[in-house]
Structure formats: structure tokens, C-alpha cells
């Protein structure tokens, strides 16, 4: 935070307010845990690939209870890589013994979905739960 403030001293109050309330930036939707649990009960493995910074992760993980339901997670701060660069998708696959051609990657950013496609994954740009369910069915994912 000090580095941010030193780069923008006129915004110190705003920077401090933002970081003190960072946990409010993460929201868990009601469908998240049941959706993950349904996928897993039908034999699908579920992983998280996130561009979260360490500080953000520490201050939002309590809000994101679905983290305990996934098979694994890879956060940018752990590997110093970011979506949509190919290395982070490759690291995800290597860490969890995944084959890109067997993965369907969901992300709310089209650029990140395109990054997944570039390494051989199928991808869905997430807009709504219902749209994602429809697109998953088009990829022959049923649960």
C-alpha cells in the first residue's frame, strides 16, 4: 500500500479506504457452491485459476466459501504469472496433472478465455449462470 501511496500521494485517503474494504470486492453468488458440488458429484474436477494478489486473497478468502469445495486452485501471487499469458494455464495443467484438451475453462473476461484456447483448452466467457449452463451443455457437460 505504501508504494501505491508514494506513486499517488494525492489519493492516500482513497487508497487506504479501498484496501481497508477490499473484502467487499469479492462476492460469492448463491449458486456457486451448489454448482461446484453438482459438477463434482457427476465426476467433474473443478479448479480455480485466479489473478488474485496475495493481499487480496488473504482479505477475501472468508467470503469465498466455495474455495473449500474445489479440487485445487492456482493464484497468480503463487507463481508470478497472470492470465491471459500461456504460462499460467500451462502451470495449472502441470500442477494438477490436467490435459488442456480435456479442460473447459470458464472466465468472465473474454481475453482470459482466449488465453485458455491458445493453450488447447475449450473456453466459455462467463456472463450469467444460465448462459454458462447452456454453453456447458453444448460442450457435452451434463449434470
Residue ranges of model-derived segments:
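Helix-loop "lid/cap" segments that line or gate small-molecule binding pockets
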Residues: 1-10
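Short acidic/histidine-centered micro-motifs embedded in hydrophobic/aromatic stretches
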Residues: 3, 18-22, 55
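Glycine-centered secondary-structure boundary/capping sites
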Residues: 5, 24, 31, 80-81, ...
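Asp-based, Mg2+/Mn2+-dependent phosphohydrolase catalytic module
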Residues: 53-54, 58-143
